[in-house]
Design a protein with these regions (language model features):
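N-terminal small/polar-rich segments of proteins
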Residues: 23-101, 105-108, 132-172
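Compositionally biased, intrinsically disordered/low-complexity regions enriched for serine, proline
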Residues: 9, 100, 123-124
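Positively charged n-region of N-terminal signal peptides that target proteins for export
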Residues: 1-4
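Bacterial N-terminal signal peptides
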Residues: 8-17
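Short beta-strand and strand-turn-strand segments in soluble, beta-rich domains
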Residues: 114-127
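Generic low-complexity segments that are intrinsically disordered, proline-rich and/or Lys/Arg-biased
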Residues: 13, 127-128
Length: 172
């Protein structure tokens, strides 16, 4: 009889425990958010142009600053004509920060004879790197300069040299 009494007391106890587990569950509805911002765009507004020059006997460099200043080293003689730094109009989210990644060396080629020159030492305003610029009001102008390595007259005969380069602008 004691066994039956003990079992009859334990059964409701186990039933109560299983009910407690069911009653311990809870659900809640939560929210999730996302905000789509304006795409970051870049438009070239001025092409990088080292202008007209003569390499003379041993060549050297033509340096174009992001601000548009032009100087030469070595025996390179600068002559009059159009020259300018590159510029890009960047648009995107209001007051967002962005990064600038400049190319390493780029080769430009003579359209008549396939002779080449190298463009190196790229510079930008604002300076390249992470968090380089801020789109105050949703836009900014970035200026680019570089150094053109010029060989001798044999290495770089007369003609127009051209090429392309890639600059990456990205949100931080």
């Amino acid at each position: 009889m004691k066994k039956i009494l003990l079992i009859s007391l334990l059964i409701p106890l186990f039933m109560g425990v299983s009910e407690i587990r069911v009653q311990a569950q809870s659900s809640v509805t939560a929210q999730v958010f996302a905000e789509v911002i304006a795409a970051l765009t870049a438009t070239e507004t001025s092409q990088l142009n080292f202008g007209r020059f003569s390499p003379e006997t041993s060549g050297g460099d033509v340096l174009m600053t992001p601000q548009g200043g032009r100087t030469s080293n070595g025996t390179v003689i600068l002559v009059s004509g159009t020259h300018n730094s590159a510029s890009f109009y960047i648009t995107g989210d209001y007051n967002a920060t962005y990064s600038i990644s400049l190319p390493t060396a780029v080769v430009i080629t003579n359209l008549n004879n396939s002779k080449t020159m190298q463009v190196t030492n790229w510079k930008s305003v604002p300076p390249a790197g992470v968090g380089a610029g801020t789109l105050r009001g949703g836009s900014e102008i970035v200026s680019i300069g570089a150094t053109l390595k010029v060989g001798t007259v044999y290495d770089n005969p007369t003609g127009i040299y051209t090429g392309t380069y890639a600059i990456t602008f990205s949100y931080n």
